[in-house]
Each structure stands twice: as structure tokens, then as C-alpha cells.
Amino acid sequence: LLSSSALVDLCRQWLPANRYESVVLSVGDNEGLATTLAPRHDDFDAVVIEQNLLDSDAREDLLKAGLLFPAVIVGEVKGHVDYHQEELHLPEDQLAQLGYNVDAAISRFLRQGRADGRQEDTATKAVGSLSRRLQERLGYLGVFYKRDPSRFLGSLAPDERRELIESLHRTYRDLLLSYFGDPAAANQALESFVNTAFFSDLPITRTVEIHVNLIDEYWKQLRLEGHKNDFLQDYRLALLDVMAHLCEMYRRSIPPDIPLPSEASNRLSVAVDQPMSSEELL
């Protein structure tokens, strides 16, 4: 659900064609998101949504209709929920991580669908229904245990590798800037970083390098401005937090003794909807 063709192109650039099939929908001037999505809700497995399109009315309509999907929200990391609790967030300057976070969003959604003790409302039933469909298509364990080696950092072309590292650098900067002042926003940035690090097989040494380089930048800037910089040592907690989350993801990546279906598709369908006229569709 994106407001411009340029943003659609950018998202498509970072959704590998051998793994994702984009489903482009047109949202009419007098139509809401729920009205557009409902007739084709079985055609896609995840959505990429621009944050400014998810106002309170649109969100309420989607929830009432039970239209809940694994979601990546494109926009500012603000620390609040725009769509549902399992959503992930990426700013526009970090879309090089989009494919990895779509994988992570689907994994989170599958885990939610298997959670116990949830109230049986329309939205919860929709989550369970989509989770079952995803399990049939992807295998019971989903994409969480099926990292694609062709998308590992070491397998990327040099330009892609550079762009991904720069994107991760910006995400980690967002994490540090909000770590003590806005824990909710910091957590969203942390999730994006950890998801990409896991699915791209980012070496731990690279994570430490990103942290050290940023802290060094801040140290030099504070020194030039004549400010104290001793407090920067406290940001080691952010690095420990990232490492703890990565350890948990790798722990979960060890499959339990659960039989896999005989057939499971690795090709995902992602809705990249564009609320524009049909003439402007790609």
C-alpha cells in the first residue's frame, strides 16, 4: 500500500523476483483499503504499507474486516502500532532490508497464529486462517527456518552488499539515538536490524564493527563540540541487547522434531498496493 510509483519501484527492487511475486492493486478515490483488499485477500501472503495511509479509520476498517496480514510498515520509526502488534517497521532510506523483513514478518505472524489463549474474535480467526494457509504453502516451520543462502551477505553482488551495510548502519544509528529516550522506537529499530542480520547471515564481527564505528563518530563529534563523552560507554547495553536478540533468533532457528509437509512453495506473494488510478499502475 504505497502512495507513489517511485516507492513501488524501490520496494520491488528489494524484493527478489525469484522469491517474491508482487500483487499490485489499485485503490480508487472513493474506496478504502479494506474494500480494495477484501476481494483478493487470498492472493497474497504479506503486505508492504506506507505509514501515512494507515490512519485510524483505515486501521479500524481493516481490523473489523479481519484483514490482517504479515506487514512491513514503510515510514518513520515512531514506536507505536500502526496496523497490528506483529508489524515491522522500515524507514524509506532502509528499504534495502525489505526482503529480509518480509520474511521476518511472516515468521512473526506464524508464531502468533500458533499462540494459545487468544480471544476468538474476527481478527484472531483471520490470523489463524492465514497462518494455516502459510504453513501449507511454506511448510509448518515457515520461512524462519528456511533462510535463503543466495541472499546471505557474502552471496550478494558488491553494490548490493554495500547498500545493505549502509542501510543497516542507518538502522543501528536510529537504535542508538532512541535507545534511552524512546524505548518503543528503539525496539522497532532493533527488530529491523536483528531481522536483517539474521536472514542475511551478517557476521557478528560486522555488527560489532557497525556499533564501534558509530560510537567513534559520536565520540569525535562530542569532543569537537567540547562536551563530555563518558556516557557513550552506556551504549554498550544496546550492543548487548542486539546480541541477545540475535542469540534468541538463532536458538529458535534450530527446528524441533516436527514433520514437514511433502510439498511447500518457497515463492511468496507480497501485496505492493498503490492507491492511484489504474493508468498509473506499473
PLM feature spans:
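Non-catalytic regulatory/interaction regions at protein termini and inter-domain linkers
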Residues: L1-L282
